[in-house]
UniProtKB/Swiss-Prot annotation:
Catalytic activity: guanosine(37) in tRNA + S-adenosyl-L-methionine = N(1)-methylguanosine(37) in tRNA + S-adenosyl-L-homocysteine + H(+)
Biological processes, Gene Ontology terms: tRNA N1-guanine methylation
Taxonomic path: Bacteria, Pseudomonadati, Spirochaetota, Spirochaetia, Leptospirales
Transmembrane segments: none
A GO molecular-function annotation: tRNA (guanine(37)-N1)-methyltransferase activity
Gene designation: trmD
Subunit structure: Homodimer.
The entry's keywords: Cytoplasm, Methyltransferase, S-adenosyl-L-methionine, Transferase, tRNA processing
Pfam family, one: tRNA_m1G_MT
Official protein name in the record: tRNA (guanine-N(1)-)-methyltransferase
Family per similarity comment: Belongs to the RNA methyltransferase TrmD family.
SUPFAM superfamilies given in the database record: alpha/beta knot
Length: 231
């Protein structure tokens, strides 16, 4: 699978994919990354890719022309074009799995400033996506997050298939069971005895019993629990 990134900050993208599991997956041929500097398609000597807003308003917009040229430069390798934007549909694991199943290249356009000329959204983009109800200073982080979520679903990315199958958001209604590592007791906090028993049937039963239901949007109780707890 191929990920194309149209960005003003190539080093930011390159840095993320140059270490850890991402780097190993690229070296193993699981997926590839193509980073495109949008300024190379500015069409002016100052490499400007933004301009003021028609009708007035604060800030600047990315121009449609350089974005269009950058997409055209990819030819058949453009695949699905995704604009990261606060006004996009909320990205989730189901979308990640659908994008992985499609197998097409993904081209990410990172938003900046006040956004992009609406003609980009209207004529050049297949999907407009958001990470949530908040605003980032640049769209690169959102592009990286989406690519990361899709790439780790690809065959050969994770060492153990069981790890992927057990992950929380690959199941629609449940979270993972609690997991522990050494030491078996710390600060008076103990690992459940059943997990130390070596009885695989009992361990499996405990894990199934202790899978957690997803509580969507219940962040108020999470914050309260955090505030009430001490370290």
């Amino acid at each position: 699978m191929k990920f194309n990134f149209i960005t003003l900050f190539p080093d930011k993208i390159q840095s993320y994919f140059s270490e850890g599991l991402q780097q190993k997956a690229i070296e193993s041929g699981v997926f590839s990354v193509n980073i495109i500097q949008l300024r190379n398609f500015s069409g002016n000597k100052h490499n400007r890719v933004d301009d003021t807003i028609y009708g007035g308003g604060p800030g600047m917009l990315l121009r449609v022309e350089p974005i269009h040229k950058a997409i055209l430069s990819l030819g058949e390798e453009k695949g699905i074009v995704i604009l990261t934007s606060p006004s996009g549909i909320p990205f989730n694991q189901s979308i990640a799995m659908d994008l992985k199943k499609g197998g097409k290249p993904l081209t990410f356009i990172s938003g900046y400033y006040e956004g992009v000329d609406h003609r980009v959204t209207e004529h050049l983009v297949d999907m407009e996506m958001s990470l949530g109800n908040y605003v980032l200073s640049a769209g690169d982080l959102a592009s990286i997050c989406i690519a990361d979520a899709v790439s780790r679903l690809l065959p050969g990315f994770l060492g153990a298939d069981e790890s992927l199958l057990d992950e929380s958001h690959n199941h629609p209604d449940i979270l993972e069971y609690p997991q522990f590592t050494k030491p078996s007791e710390y600060n008076g906090w103990k690992v459940p005895d059943v997990l130390l028993s070596g009885n695989h049937a009992s361990i499996l039963a405990w894990r199934e019993q202790n899978r957690k239901k997803i509580e969507r949007g219940n962040y108020e109780s999470t914050f309260k629990r955090s505030a009430d707890s001490g370290c």
